[in-house]
Amino acid sequence: MLMRKTLLLALLVLLSLGLALLVLEWVYRAQLVDTYRPELHTFNPGQVIAPDGKPALLVIGDSFTAGRTSYAGILQDTLQEWRVINAAVSGTGVLQALYMAPHRFAQFHPAIFLYQAYVGNDLFDIRYPTNWRTTSPGRNIYWFLANHLRVVGYLNYRLRQVGERLTSNQRQALSPRVATAATATADPTTAFAVEHYDARVKIYVRAEPSLLEDSILVQGSRRHDYAIFLEKLAQLLAYCQQEVCRAYILVIPHICQVDEAYLTYMGQLGARFTTPAAMRLSEYPFLVGLRARFTSWSHVHIVNPLAMLREMHRQQAVYYANDEHLNPGGQQALAAWLAQQLRLQ
């Protein structure tokens, strides 16, 4: 009898949690509450958000774009004749951009819409893999749930922020000597090292060693994910009406496409490349597919900074050594290049 009551209670708890998640999923996807409003107000000064008669340039993207020190933040400071609205959110992809688009377009009515894509993990965001041999059970269960309930990823994002704030507060409470040591330990090194590379990237390539190559070359199981990506991107770009708005898709390349040494380095992290020479292509399948999909959309333009980043990298590094993101020099170069490509100066 006791066992039966326990099982019944457990079932009721699971049903309650499941129902709560379904309700949260509906609220999240429909954005009945603007769940990314905090980022909008963090990355944009009040005078930028408020209408002032200037045309608006709306930028949506992931961690390459989010933040005041990104190329979008730099454009905010340099393009005096435009309201540059940075609506990017770290860890998001085209699915999340599609969720937040109705709010952003209704609020800002952009004359230009820039969507930043990243070839390195945009298809990963469409479908998280499961790999029970190289990835922990907890991670596999999380990815399985996140594939079907997108609010799970959002909740994880918010919980991670809470954890980072708590860690930051604890460091501030340390003695000056210990705090200085903690800060020094967190600083990125100037040379690649497996032990220092971004842990998240190492988890991704262990779970799916062919992720980078399959994404860049649109092959294997990622071919289907790319088709979904294009479909969702078309839905997103439909908010940019041709009569009043022109759109740009900025495709950020992976560092291994800019610096060939990172083909070897990514291999040390667990990535697999069967055709490494294809990583040198300037017009690679991920990019070519975008051009083909939107060739009839006269107000949509694909911008490819790969050649510029390669040229800049010959002079100085444009990516961090142990992180897949652009460093401050890379962000500055991208901002200057974009201002020309978007015909803003």
Task: Tell where the protein language model's regions lie, with residue ranges.
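Structural recognition of alpha->loop->beta junctions
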Residues: 286-302
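Short, solvent-exposed loop/turn segments at secondary-structure junctions
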Residues: 64-66, 90-92, 118-122, 253-258, ...
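Extracytoplasmic/secreted envelope proteins and their assembly/folding machinery
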Residues: 72, 76, 98-102, 230-233, ...
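Serine-dependent acyl-ester chemistry module
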Residues: 120-291, 310
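Short, amphipathic alpha-helical "lid/cap" segments that border enzyme active or binding sites
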Residues: 94, 98, 226, 230, ...
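N-terminal secretory targeting modules
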Residues: 1-57, 107-111
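Histidine-centered active-site loop/cap adjacent to the catalytic His
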Residues: 24, 320-345
